[in-house]
């Protein structure tokens, strides 16, 4: 895991270096970002498809963790913060627990996490997509509900990851159109 963190740092440092006579690679990649977004979302969906059945079969709860209020936050003035917090929530709380539920899915969950980290890195590099500081109440509600579900929360959160991808897509589509 440490080597992947080092690799991410190298990618960031390489992307920030200015090219003679041109904008930075970061600026250039930001102009291409809207065109690359569908590919990044497809990669997330493909990675999720490898673990979707496992987690949805284990999710025995009837309630929904990722409610419509979260999508509304994604579409509202808190969209940036809600997206940032949800990415952090999945990377730091959900996926580390999900990796430990079955050795057969660990690699696939890790791959899904790496795809999500790549998206976060590109969003941060292109400040117009993720320039935020405020807290989202909907994200807090998701985190509280997740905590209350205890071990079952991992199954619930992972089984709804496709909803999260759809919310990311709705947020990014809105930002690109503005």
Swiss-Prot record:
Any GO BP: negative regulation of interleukin-6 production
SMART domains for this protein: IL10
Extent of the signal sequence: 1-18
Disulfide bonds: 30-126, 80-132
Broad class of the protein's primary localization: secreted
GO cellular component terms given for this protein: extracellular space
SUPFAM superfamilies (UniProt xref): 4-helical cytokines
One Pfam family this sequence matches: IL10
Recorded superkingdom: Eukaryota
Residues carrying a glycan: 134
Secreted keyword on record: yes
Record flagged with keyword Repeat: no
Keywords, in A-Z order: Cytokine, Disulfide bond, Glycoprotein, Secreted, Signal
One example GO MF annotation: cytokine activity
Family from the record: Belongs to the IL-10 family.
Protein's name according to its UniProt entry: Interleukin-10
Source species: Papio hamadryas
């Amino acid at each position: 895991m440490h080597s992947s963190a080092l690799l991410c740092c190298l990618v960031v440092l390489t992307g920030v270096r200015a090219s003679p006579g041109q904008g930075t690679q970061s600026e250039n990649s930001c102009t291409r970002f809207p065109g690359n977004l569908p590919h990044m979302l497809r990669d997330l969906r493909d990675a999720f498809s490898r673990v979707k059945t496992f987690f949805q079969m284990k999710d025995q709860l009837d309630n929904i963790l990722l409610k419509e209020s979260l999508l509304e936050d994604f579409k509202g003035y808190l969209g940036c913060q809600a997206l940032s917090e949800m990415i952090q929530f999945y990377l730091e709380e959900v996926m580390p627990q999900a990796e430990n539920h079955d050795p057969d899915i660990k690699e696939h969950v890790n791959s899904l996490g790496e795809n999500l980290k790549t998206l976060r890195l590109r969003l941060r590099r292109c400040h117009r997509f993720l320039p935020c500081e405020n807290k989202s109440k909907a994200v807090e509600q998701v985190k509280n509900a997740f905590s209350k579900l205890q071990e079952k929360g991992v199954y619930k959160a992972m089984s709804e990851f496709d909803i999260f991808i759809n919310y990311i897509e709705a947020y990014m589509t809105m930002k690109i159109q503005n």
